[in-house]
Amino acid sequence: MIYTCLSPAKINLFLYVTGRRKDGYHNIQTLFQFLDYGDQFKIIANKTGNIELFTEKKIFMNVQNSIIIAAKLLKKTALLQGKLQNSSYGAKIFLKKNIPMGSGLGGGSSNAATTLVVLNKLWNTQYTLKELSLLGLRIGADVPGFVMGNTAVIEGIGDILYPIVQKEKWYLVVYPCINISTRYMFSSPFLMSNTAKKSLQVLLKTPFKNDFENIAKKQFVPIKKLIRMLSSYAPSRMTGTGSCVFSEFDNKKSAQKIFSVLPKNVQGFIAKSVNISPLHKTLYKR
């Protein structure tokens, strides 16, 4: 069986760090929304027993890549729980990468979630999305949001999701050619991890902010300059722990107009936000 799909990017419309847990992880509150832009996937299920990842330049089998980790985790769990009868289940996964790494757009997490959701279908392991999201949490905090496939306010360590409907808008997303490690940002001495936790109603009525933005502006001058430049045209802020910055527009034409006047060396794209993940729209016909 073959399945071709989009592994979508996301933006964080707001992101607050509300405390540090005893286990060292941080609690967050974030508004997580999908874009109709992302990496291109083609997954071919087979009975070779192997998980193979093909990119435009390399073939991977035994590497610490989120796609291979997700596929092997699903297979191992399904075998232990009797949802797969033998170890012959395998897959060839072809990836065309469009989402920059370390950009705050969730590329690695999206890839892991896409792998879990699609192989669950192709291998007929019959896990619910909730069950897959719990598996995904073992890979990364953003993975459950991608697995569930709805715009959501996400809390805790990524394990508490409140699906909502958010107005779909157009975004100009600009990449400053800087890769920022999530771990690096969470360990920053400048991180104030005590933003007051708010109710869902208050969160959605309060002007949106990102607790990591001031840290990024202090440590990465290009991000500071980029936010200043884009904010002169439209409401703009950083997504995730960086490095991408997005500007918000009511229509595509307005986004294109601003993109056209930016310096020619600026890298970016225009995308529409969507309340249902493009993956889930095609896979589940939502």
UniProtKB/Swiss-Prot annotation:
E.C. number(s) listed in UniProt: 2.7.1.148
Cystines in this chain: none
GO function terms (MF aspect): 4-(cytidine 5'-diphospho)-2-C-methyl-D-erythritol kinase activity; ATP binding
GO biological process: isopentenyl diphosphate biosynthetic process, methylerythritol 4-phosphate pathway; terpenoid biosynthetic process
Record's catalysed reaction(s): 4-CDP-2-C-methyl-D-erythritol + ATP = 4-CDP-2-C-methyl-D-erythritol 2-phosphate + ADP + H(+)
Pathway(s) it belongs to: Isoprenoid biosynthesis; isopentenyl diphosphate biosynthesis via DXP pathway; isopentenyl diphosphate from 1-deoxy-D-xylulose 5-phosphate: step 3/6
Entry keywords, A to Z: ATP-binding, Isoprene biosynthesis, Kinase, Nucleotide-binding, Transferase
Active-site residues, record numbering mapped to chain: K10, D142
PANTHER family, alphabetized: 4-DIPHOSPHOCYTIDYL-2-C-METHYL-D-ERYTHRITOL KINASE, CHLOROPLASTIC
Oligomeric form and interacting partners: Homodimer.
Family: Belongs to the GHMP kinase family. IspE subfamily.
Entry protein name: 4-diphosphocytidyl-2-C-methyl-D-erythritol kinase
Organism: Buchnera aphidicola subsp. Acyrthosiphon pisum (strain APS)
GN (gene name): ispE
